[in-house]
């Protein structure tokens, strides 16, 4: 069996959960079968890379993406099965299936109709990305959802989709890469920032998008206990508008309290591991999240999590066991922000519970989110669609 794995992101260009998913999945699948990675961007080891047509440099970003999809589809002719990830490569998978009469497996990491804020980023291209996703999903031989909540969303958004074709295979975590680091050393990223190791610390890691709820967290931080520091590892803004909103919110917070740190540069895994391990609590304020690999990363570092109760997050963060879930209400932003602050303050005030949540979170990662198991599940899907 030869798999053509289609992805926008692949190391060293990985900036989101879908890229992490593909990276880890490929590493384990290659122990089981032949996998050719087809990605977008600059040439790199271990993958075939494709750039958008330069003649579309000033075109809408969706059109530019689709030009790379066409080349990617053409390159998948030798595959036994083609496996696409996100709308960015869904059309390539769909076309390869038609051209070469091979099965198409599609992993949905999010759903375009449930991310209306993408209009800010893509303009009319949002309608294109939505059309691409719908076309590919409804024609795929199998669809993988990264959580049960995601599967439910898919069947609701695409009611004509055959439920028997939609399988749940959750994201995973490599607990040998993500583990509790020792105390921050002199010269470490936290020491260089000036973070006080004797004060509690709440941490956020993620992209600056409306989906991730960064402004909700920064606003909630006005209600944090006065000794709580906030470390935001946040970059790769979707749009200048949302970047400006976060910038204004962080500046206002910093005027009103000490211990506000914003890291906009891309960090290494080692640096992120250090920050997550040092955190008193990791906060995930997402307003939409099919699963949320970053919660697994924090849990693997034995850190308690405070997270919204949206999407697949409750399938990762066990409320009252590995962290605290906070109800998100799109019609009550103020209430949501107050609840986030309350949950953070409660764990800061109870270090024993925070420590217990952290240890339980790491055990949950080890026992239930192994990439080796996820690769076996994925291979089973390939076998079924090729039978």
From Swiss-Prot:
Gene3D superfamilies: Glycogen Phosphorylase B. Keywords: Capsule biogenesis/degradation, Carbohydrate metabolism, Glycosyltransferase, Transferase. It catalyses: ADP-alpha-D-glucose + alpha-D-glucose 1-phosphate = alpha-maltose 1-phosphate + ADP + H(+). Disruption phenotype: Inactivation of glgM affects the production of extracellular alpha-glucan (two-fold reduction), but not that of intracellular glycogen and 6-O-methylglucosyl lipopolysaccharides (MGLP). Cells lacking this gene are also impaired in their ability to persist in both the spleen and the lungs of mice. Combined inactivation of both glgM and ostA is lethal, potentially due to accumulation of toxic levels of ADP-glucose. Combined inactivation of both glgM and treS results in absence of alpha-glucan. Its EC number is 2.4.1.342. GO terms for biological process: capsule polysaccharide biosynthetic process; glucan biosynthetic process; glycogen biosynthetic process. The keyword Endoplasmic reticulum does not apply. Pathway: Capsule biogenesis; capsule polysaccharide biosynthesis; Glycan biosynthesis; glycogen biosynthesis. One of its GO terms (molecular function) is glycosyltransferase activity. Inhibited at high G1P concentrations. The keyword Transferase applies. PANTHER family: ALPHA-MALTOSE-1-PHOSPHATE SYNTHASE (PTHR12526:SF590), GLYCOSYLTRANSFERASE (PTHR12526). Maltose-1-phosphate (M1P) is generated by two alternative routes: the TreS-Pep2 branch and the GlgC-GlgM branch, however it seems that TreS-Pep2 branch provides most of M1P for the GlgE pathway in M.tuberculosis. Attempts to disrupt both the Rv3032 gene and glgA in order to create a mutant simultaneously deficient in both alpha-1,4-glucosyltransferases turned out to be unsuccessful. Thus, M.tuberculosis H37Rv requires a functional copy of at least one of these two genes for growth. Belongs to the glycosyltransferase group 1 family. Involved in the biosynthesis of the maltose-1-phosphate (M1P) building block required for alpha-glucan production by the key enzyme GlgE. Catalyzes the formation of an alpha-1,4 linkage between glucose from ADP-glucose and glucose 1-phosphate (G1P) to yield maltose-1-phosphate (M1P). Also able to catalyze the elongation of the non-reducing ends of glycogen, maltodextrin and maltoheptaose using ADP-glucose as sugar donor, however the rate of the reaction appears to be too low to be physiologically relevant. This is Alpha-maltose-1-phosphate synthase. It comes from Mycobacterium tuberculosis (strain ATCC 25618 / H37Rv). The lineage of its organism: Bacteria, Bacillati, Actinomycetota, Actinomycetes, Mycobacteriales. The gene is glgM.
């Amino acid at each position: 069996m030869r798999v053509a794995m289609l992805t926008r992101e692949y190391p060293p260009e990985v900036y989101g959960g879908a890229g992490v998913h593909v990276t880890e999945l490929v590493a384990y699948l290659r122990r089981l079968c032949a996998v050719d990675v087809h990605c977008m961007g600059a040439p790199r080891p271990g993958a075939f890379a494709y750039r958008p047509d330069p003649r579309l440099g000033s075109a809408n970003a969706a059109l530019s993406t689709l030009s790379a999809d066409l080349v990617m589809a053409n390159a998948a002719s030798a595959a036994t099965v083609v496996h696409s990830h996100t709308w960015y490569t869904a059309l390539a998978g769909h076309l390869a299936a038609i051209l070469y009469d091979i099965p198409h497996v599609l992993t949905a990491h999010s759903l375009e109709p449930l991310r209306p804020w993408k209009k800010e980023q893509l303009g009319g291209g949002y309608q294109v990305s939505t059309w691409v996703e719908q076309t590919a999903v409804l024609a795929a031989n199998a669809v993988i959802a990264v959580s049960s909540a995601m599967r439910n969303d898919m069947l609701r958004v695409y009611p004509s989709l055959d439920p028997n074709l939609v399988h749940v295979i959750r994201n995973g975590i490599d607990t040998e890469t993500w583990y509790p680091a020792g105390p921050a050393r002199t010269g470490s990223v936290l020491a260089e920032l000036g973070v006080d190791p004797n004060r509690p610390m709440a941490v956020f890691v993620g992209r600056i998008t409306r989906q991730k709820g960064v402004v909700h967290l920064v606003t909630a931080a006005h209600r944090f206990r006065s000794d709580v520091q906030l470390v935001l590892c946040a970059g790769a803004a979707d749009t200048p508008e949302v970047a400006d909103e976060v910038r204004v919110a962080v500046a206002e917070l910093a005027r009103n309290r000490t211990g506000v740190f914003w890291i906009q540069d891309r960090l290494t895994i080692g640096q992120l591991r250090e920050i997550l391990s040092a955190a008193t609590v990791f906060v995930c304020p997402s307003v939409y999240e099919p699963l949320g690999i970053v919660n697994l990363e924090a849990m693997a570092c034995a850190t308690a999590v405070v997270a919204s109760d949206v999407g697949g997050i409750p399938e990762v963060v066990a409320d009252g066991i590995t962290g605290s879930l906070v109800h998100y209400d799109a019609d009550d932003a103020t209430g949501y922000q107050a609840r986030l602050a309350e949950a953070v303050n409660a764990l800061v005030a109870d270090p024993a519970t925070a420590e217990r949540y952290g240890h339980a979170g790491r055990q949950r990662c080890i026992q239930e989110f192994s990439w080796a198991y996820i690769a076996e599940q994925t291979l089973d899907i390939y076998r079924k669609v090729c039978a």
